[in-house]
Amino acid sequence: MEIFGVPLPAMLSQLLLGLVNGSFYAMLSLGLAVIFGLLNVINFAHGALFMLGAVLTWMGFSYLGVPYWAMLVLSPLAIGLLGVVIERTLLRFIYKLDHLYGLLLTLGVTLVIEGVFRAIYGVSGLPYNTPDLLQGATDLGFMVLPNYRAWVVVASLAVCFATWFMIEKTKLGAYLRAGTENPKLVEAFGVNVPLMVTLTYGFGVALAAFAGVLAAPVIQISPLMGQSMIITVFAVVVIGGMGSILGSIVTGLGLGVIEGLTKVFYPQASATVVFVIMVLVLLVRPAGLFGKEK
């Protein structure tokens, strides 16, 4: 069976690949949206911390024999703690300044992190095997579904939904959102706003690290792997709407699928289709698809 001259298995394979990439886009843009929406900081270090999550996973297994499933928890925790240190020692001084200062500061953090790991490991890829439980594939009849890629999509959707629910539907999320609008009012309810801000940044970068762990068996691990991802992720955030949690999730997944299908029908445009969509969206709706017009 063919669709527009393309065999169905080939199209479904690219659709799945698009969903996997879209899962990474959604996870990373979600972390960026949390940080920008609640802290008003453009976190350019997100790509480097995504890379660091993958590198820590490789180091944990290579040097200590720590399995993938343990690193799925330990790596985000470690990067989250690093995020707390970054927020307390650097970012806290630029909250009242222009966005450009936050962008430049986090760019500097990116260059330091990438430079250190490039000096130690070089730029060649570090292999990381798929965990035994998720090796192989499942034959669905109409296509062969790689087990690990299916896991990436399911795990990403679960984390994205849990994050959206926490921020939009719980009392904690209400405090977080109110803290960005009127911190003094929130403090009057006994909430430690500076601590809340610190933990928010830590949580946002932990999401990037979680995506890095998921990516380790799929993308060759290298100190520069975040660079190839972060520009596209920023485009996703702009299209979805800066600071929009739901926009980041839906747009990330949607653009991943569009990118995957573009590779089937017009491969030459697959590297630019996301940015073409970004330009068109900004012309029609400058605040993004899910953003609020000011």
Name each region found by the language model.
Residues 65-109, 116, 250-251, 255, ...:
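Alpha-helical transmembrane segments within multi-pass membrane transporters and channels
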Residues 54-58, 76-82, 107-117, 155-164, ...:
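Hydrophobic core segments of alpha-helical transmembrane domains in multi-pass membrane transport
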Residues 21, 143-221, 245-251:
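Helix-loop-helix "hairpin" substructures at the membrane interface of multi-pass membrane proteins
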Residues 25, 29, 65-77, 201-208, ...:
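Transmembrane alpha-helical segments in multi-pass inner-membrane proteins
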Residues 16, 38-85, 89:
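Membrane-embedded helix boundary and interhelical linker motif in transport proteins
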Residues 10, 89, 120, 181-188, ...:
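Cytosolic-side transmembrane-helix boundaries in multi-pass membrane proteins
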Residues 1-27, 56, 67-71, 97-101, ...:
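Membrane-interfacial amphipathic/re-entrant helices at transmembrane-helix boundaries
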